[in-house]
Amino acid sequence: TYLCENCDVLSIHCYQPADEMQRFIDLMKTFNRPIFCTEYLARPFGSTFETVMPVLKKEKVAAYDFGLVKGAMQCHYEWNKVDADGNKIPFTEEPELWFHDILHPDGTPYNAAEVEFIKSMTKK
């Protein structure tokens, strides 16, 4: 509470579906500070552009996505994937559902419909 009451801007991360994002934003709004969501995309967790961006836009929360182009950081892989015993599961193939990232290294979209949705949400 002290930190939120004494900072100029609130920077949040939320990798949850839209309803959880809304609850988190509602809580942060009680501090009457501008809110920046600096990480939110986690497709396997239900946090997608299509579900979360409308909430962010409605609440006037500034936001940007952590990943852009699939590359050396391998943000298209889900982090902390572990088995029932807590052992890290290595990735042996390309994930069907990317975690972060929007574009392939050649600039083509991972999901063209998703890119069109992003464009539609960012128009004035």
List PLM regions with ranges.
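Substrate-binding clefts and catalytic carboxylate motifs of secreted carbohydrate-active enzymes
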Residues: 1-124
